[in-house]
UniProtKB/Swiss-Prot annotation:
Family matches, as Pfam families: ABC_tran, UvrA_DNA-bind, UvrA_inter
Family matches, as CDD domains: ABC_UvrA_I (cd03270), ABC_UvrA_II (cd03271)
Binding site for ATP: 48-55, 676-683
Key words, A-Z: ATP-binding, Cytoplasm, DNA damage, DNA excision, DNA repair, DNA-binding, Excision nuclease, Metal-binding, Nucleotide-binding, Repeat, SOS response, Zinc, Zinc-finger
Taxonomy of the source species: Bacteria, Pseudomonadati, Pseudomonadota, Alphaproteobacteria, Hyphomicrobiales
Keyword NADP: no
Annotated ranges, domain ABC transporter: 345-624, 644-972
Function (record text): The UvrABC repair system catalyzes the recognition and processing of DNA lesions. UvrA is an ATPase and a DNA-binding protein. A damage recognition complex composed of 2 UvrA and 2 UvrB subunits scans DNA for abnormalities. When the presence of a lesion has been verified by UvrB, the UvrA molecules dissociate.
Keyword Cell membrane: no
UniProt name for this protein: UvrABC system protein A
């Protein structure tokens, strides 16, 4: 530990725990028994190399202990419902507050979770529509209202005195039947007259009705002449009518009505039959007088798509329905029928499908060598959707028996639908699901709600329309709502609107103006999810809390970074301690206090290299971060490679999501950056359109591409690889060694050792996934899980293998004194040195070293790797493959979780891939990466509806000069201070 830092700590007084979080002896993961004091109520940034111990200190020590102490203070009953954190390996922590962690994990993969529900904006919207929304009739477009009996009486008494009226109970409205039994029942109850299909009759002399035709029947409850003293009688008559007609009553004018007051006309729903008198419908419920469309009581649950009371019955509130996609069933229309044109049948080895197609060919006059595109439309429809009543003769033979049958053909798509519904096999269901795609629900048009909810409007909009707006446009709309409401409604809505507007403002402040409120949470990136939770926390207004954040700037353009940092300062100014694990230069410079952890990664990290204000960090010669902040070290700009405009991949008229018929050319053999503000359309262009379209063409992938006309230039590449941040495995059994393929030669090496050969061990003996060499007590896991209910689940080291995963006999086979279990426990750096005599193993670990993953363990569970680490493991796997020089690599924000120094190493690797003739395209906001690109495509200019256009393209220098490019504005000063080697000019490159 630095002597200066120790002396500084000794000078601090005994009351420092009130002003600081004091940590003594932190040893979690790679932390080297460190002591540190973090000032309270400040914005504190933890920085350092990837794997140096930042998250171990911030999340696994400080947050874990703060959360553990809070949960421990609750009753045993409450604790069983909460996740208990293990006590971190630390001697003492003082000055802790209740801790809240805001990490990069996606909020929820549940399709019912949306931006609106996660931020609680939608909950307030439901309340707003329930309290001040006005229902409108789908038939007439007029407002429909419910009234109390008192309101009904008041409306009638407001008519001119002397007006003659009939008070009717509309018991039958447009329904077929004879109604003999009902007519007799009403007569028995004492009613005298009835109006049937527009004509009054004595009940005793009512005509016989034709049951084949619909009828309207109104029972006459009372005949009234409007006078001031009939209020009591009117109330009783209304109650009788409402009871008889299930909440409805009609007042019909016996003469032509006199003009009612203007306000009354507005409030009263009327119907006017050309051949009959004018009527006023009153309803205890909400009901349309023309169509009979009724709404139950308007309450918040009516607007919830997660509640059967409000969800669209057709799609169950999901807003989409699954349909078989014809393009997925027939991905390549150039293929012959017998060569796999019908994808679901192409993989099967069963003769059934060939025999079925042969029979169809005989019937419809085609052969198995006929290309799909050459079939007549009628034949294609019959193959896909069935032959209808047309019977076809089929002959089947399975090697045992043969038989003939004559029947209609159900069709490939019909067959997929039926099997998907009927199968109980999860595997079969997953296979069939590849041919489905989501389409907006036809019943609710994707709004998720039943018709009754969508007819309720605030102003002129129903709740579904506002959910489809971006955060920015929704904010503008909610500002105008008070103008559309009357005084009473504004009193009700005032507090609700305030809460909604505040939450929308917080989302704007963290750069999420482009998201729609209906956007599914599962489609958000880790950075977007984290910033949504950050906005929610500011909305909660808590004080005295410890917030721990993990790189909130991920996925955020430099333009929006200042607003994010203002948000963090606002959180601090509320009286909270904000600890941020961050590599962003602006965030480090803005911090009140910085901890630089290092000096290296993994076993070489875990020390406090420097601490203090940003200025003190920059003055500390030991701080690698400080050297990058001062400019002593930097990511250098390599010489640009000139584009060859004859070798490009061209996307023509991409129009998915917010893209506005974009045509983009990506030069091959270069390092290209796709840039632009968040929500500008980068992922839609690169992942949803380019990658999916090419992957379907080259790899027969099942996911459909976003709408576009065509992709040109595919002849120049032989494969496309999306190196994303999804986990390298879904189970703890998957690890870097198994994913990169290094574990197979390791097992083969151990199987080739003299001791293993003498015992007859094969490579399978050294696998922890199969019986033989693994410990059967824990089935190769090394630990046994014990559920503790109101305490955290305890993972006890297996008594039999002592956590080694293998049985004793397998562990007796040693190489250089190490067993297979010892190898799995090594870091990548240790393993590369250990296997330096085994080229196949050494080379794989060296590629992991080159992407900056020295510190991860060979057998580390895949589920414990961050998104950035998983992405770099995938990159290492690609690096270890034999290069063809014709691969297109796509990476989405590969600098996630990387320090300046790690970025430098990553860029060396990416440029090496390009040097081999490959093409690398990255979506990136990091200016240190953008400045090293050969070519840049900048999308925007804004996010959401304001984006979706190519603002600028060319070398970084051209982007810096583009007047409409936000990226260029921030890139220009970075390029000016960058060290520039001699390079070709753009004009030379063009030649």
């Amino acid at each position: 530990m630095d002597e200066v830092i120790k002396a500084k700590r000794q000078q601090q007084n005994a009351g420092s725990s009130l002003r600081a979080i004091t940590i003594r002896g932190a040893r979690e993961h790679n932390l080297k028994n460190i002591d540190v004091e973090i000032p309270r109520d400040k914005l504190v940034v933890f920085t350092g190399l990837s794997g140096s111990g930042k998250s171990s200190l911030a999340f696994d020590t400080i947050y874990a202990e703060g959360q553990r102490r809070y949960v421990e203070s609750l009753s045993a009953y409450a604790r069983q419902f909460l996740e208990m954190m293990q006590k971190p390996d630390v001697d003492q922590i003082d000055g802790l507050s209740p801790a809240i962690s805001i990490e990069q994990k996606t909020t929820s993969k549940n399709p019912r979770s949306t931006v609106g529900t996660v931020t609680e904006i939608y909950d307030y919207m439901r309340l707003l529509w329930a309290r001040v929304g006005v229902p409108y009739s789908p038939a007439t477009g007029l407002p429909i209202e419910s009234q109390t009996v008192s309101q009904m009486v008041d409306r009638v008494l407001a008519l001119p005195e002397g007006t003659r009226l009939y008070l009717l109970a509309p018991v039958v409205r447009g329904r077929k039947g004879e109604y003999r039994k009902e007519l007799a029942e009403w007569l028995k109850k004492g009613f005298q007259r009835v109006k049937i299909d527009g004509t009054f009759h004595e009940l005793a002399e009512a005509p016989t009705l034709d049951k084949k035709f619909p009828h309207d029947i109104d029972v006459v409850v009372d005949r009234i002449v409007v006078r001031a003293d009939i209020g009591q009688r009117l109330a009783e008559s209304f109650e009788t009518a409402l009871k008889l007609a299930e909440g409805l009553a009609v007042v019909e004018f016996a003469d032509a009505p006199a003009a009612a007051p203007a306000e009354e006309k507005k409030k009263t729903a009327k119907i006017h039959d050309k051949s009959g008198p004018e009527r006023i419908l009153f309803s205890e419920k909400f009901a349309c007088p023309v169509s009979g469309f009724t709404i139950p009581e308007i309450e918040p649950r009516l607007f919830s798509f997660n509640n059967p009371y409000g969800a669209c019955p057709a799609c169950g509130g999901l807003g989409v329905e699954q349909h078989v996609d014809e393009d997925l069933v027939i991905p390549d229309k150039e293929l012959a029928i017998g060569k796999g044109a019908i994808a679901p049948w192409a993989k099967s080895s069963s003769p059934y499908y060939v025999q079925t197609l042969t029979a169809l060919g005989k019937h419809y006059k085609f052969t198995l060598t006929t290309k799909w595109k050459d079939l007549p439309k009628k034949t294609r429809d019959a193959i896909l959707h069935g032959s209808g009543e047309d019977e076809i003769k089929f002959s089947y033979e399975d090697g045992v028996r043969s038989y003939d049958t004559k029947k209609p053909f159900e069709g490939v798509i019909t067959n997929i639908n039926r099997r998907y519904r009927e199968t109980e096999s999860e595997w079969a269901r997953e296979e069939l699901a590849k041919y489905f795609h989501d389409v907006p629900c036809g019943a609710c048009n994707g709004f998720r709600l039943k018709p009754e909810a969508l007819c309720v409007k605030v102003g002129t909009k129903h709740i579904g329309e506002i959910s489809e707006l971006s955060v920015k446009k929704a904010g503008e709309w909610f500002e105008t709502v008070p103008e559309a409401l009357n005084k009473q409604q504004n009193e009700i809505a005032g507090r609700i609107l305030k809460e909604i507007r505040e939450r929308l403002t917080f989302l704007l402040d963290v750069g999420l103006n482009y998201l729609t409120l209906s956007r599914s949470s599962g489609t958000l990136s880790g950075g977007e999810s984290q910033r949504i939770r950050l906005a929610s926390q500011i909305g909660s207004g808590l004080t005295g809390v410890l917030y721990v954040l993990d790189e909130p700037s991920i996925g955020l353009h430099q333009r929006d970074n200042a607003r994010l940092l203002d948000t963090l300062k606002r959180l601090r100014d509320l009286g909270n301690t904000v600890v941020v694990v961050e590599h962003d230069e602006d965030a480090i410079r803005l911090a009140d206090y910085v901890l630089d952890i290092g000096p290296g990664a993994g076993m070489h990290g875990g020390h406090i290299v420097a601490e203090g204000t940003p200025a003190e960090i920059m003055r500390n010669p030991k701080s690698l971060t400080g050297k990058y902040l001062t400019g002593e070290l930097e990511v250098e700009v390599p010489e640009r490679r000139p584009p060859n405009h004859r070798r490009t991949i061209k996307v023509v008229n991409a129009r998915g999501n917010n893209l506005k018929n974009v045509t983009a050319e990506i030069p091959l053999g270069l390092f290209t950056c796709v840039t632009g503000v968040s929500g500008g359309g980068k992922s839609t262009l690169l992942i949803d359109t380019l990658y999916r379209a090419i992957a379907r063409k080259l790899n027969n992938a099942s996911e459909g591409a976003a709408p576009h006309d065509r992709i040109e230039g595919l002849e120049h590449i032989d494969k496309i690889i999306d190196i994303d941040q999804s986990p390298i495995g879904r189970t703890p059994r998957s690890n870097p060694a198994t994913y990169t393929g290094a574990f197979t030669p390791i097992r083969e090496w151990f199987a080739g050792l003299p001791e293993a050969k003498a015992r007859g061990y094969e490579p399978g003996r050294f696998s922890f996934n199969v019986k033989g060499g693994r410990c059967e007590a824990c089935q190769g896991d090394g630990v046994i899980k014990i559920e503790m209910h109101f305490l955290p689940d305890v993972y006890v080291t297996c008594d039999v293998c002592k956590g080694k995963r293998y049985n004793r006999e397998t562990l007796e086979v040693l190489f250089k004194g190490k067993s297979i279990a010892d190898v799995l426990d090594m870091t990548v750096e240790e393993a590369a040195d250990f296997f330096k005599a085994v080229p196949r193993v050494r080379e794989t670990f060296q590629t992991l070293h080159r992407v900056g993953l020295d510190y991860i363990h060979v057998g580390q569970q895949a589920t414990t790797l961050s998104g950035g680490e998983a992405q770099r493991v995938k990159l290492a796997k690609e690096l270890s493959k034999r290069a063809t020089g014709r691969t297109l690599y796509i990476l989405d924000e590969p600098t996630t979780g990387l320090h300046f120094h790690d970025v430098k190493k990553l860029l060396e690797v990416l440029h090496e891939l390009v040097a081999q003739g490959n093409t690398v395209v990255v979506i990136e906001h990091n200016l240190e990466v953008i400045k090293t690109a050969d070519w840049v495509i900048d999308l925007g200019p804004e996010g959401g509806d304001g984006g979706g256009e190519i603002v600028a393209w060319g070398p970084p220098e051209d982007i810096a000069k583009a007047p409409r490019s936000y990226t260029g504005k921030f890139l220009e000063p970075v390029l000016k201070k960058a060290r520039k080697p001699k390079r070709r000019s753009t004009s030379e490159a063009a030649e």
